[in-house]
Amino acid sequence: RDSSTSRGLGDVYKRQPVHRAFNTLIGLNSVRQMNTPEAWSSGVPAFGGVASARGMAQFYQACLGLDELRVFPSAVRGWMRNVVIDGPDLTLKTPTAFSCGFMHDPADPATGRKLRHLFGSGGFGHAGAGGSHAFADPAHGLSFGYAMNRMDLNVLPGVKTRNLISAVMKEVAEECF
């Protein structure tokens, strides 16, 4: 391999938005560093939501308004559900859709059909580091939380997580009919 070519590609990568997004100022340069109390409390934007699967599911029950305390007012729950941006994500290099604070399944602009099925029918949530995933599905009154014991290195949920989501949604669909 030509070292000048390698160096040139590295320089190109460093100018990309994805490099800035995934290389923080405090230097979390490995998966192992992410799983420490110091990293969790560092206050890095878009990082640090540490919870159990049960805790994530309970949070999304609150997002649906199905919690005992009614933490989120109806208007706020509307902001969670309504997509405000849907299109190409220049950082992740894939289509994404977001409401205020939550991911949604992106839609094909030509047909309106979902490009991915990660959040249920009209659902919203967030993919987490390493394959963890959580969401609320308002159509079924369902909240879902999945925390991995061993990190998957995909940016979006990998095959294992997607298969689990598919199995849950299939079961929910069968229960409703």
Identify what each model region corresponds to.
Residues 12, 53, 154-155:
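Loop/helix-junction capping segments adjacent to catalytic residues or to phosphate/diphosphate-binding pockets
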Residues 2, 86-89, 137:
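Acidic side chains
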Residues 127-177:
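Structured C-terminal helix/loop/strand segments within mature extracytoplasmic catalytic/sensor domains
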Residues 1-13:
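Single conserved hydrophobic/aromatic residue that forms the stacking wall/gate
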Residues 1, 45, 130:
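Generic anion/oxyanion-binding catalytic loop in active/binding sites
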Residues 18-126, 174:
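Conserved active-site loop region of the serine DD-peptidase/beta-lactamase
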Residues 8, 101, 128-131:
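Glycine-centered small-residue hotspots that permit tight backbone geometry or close packing
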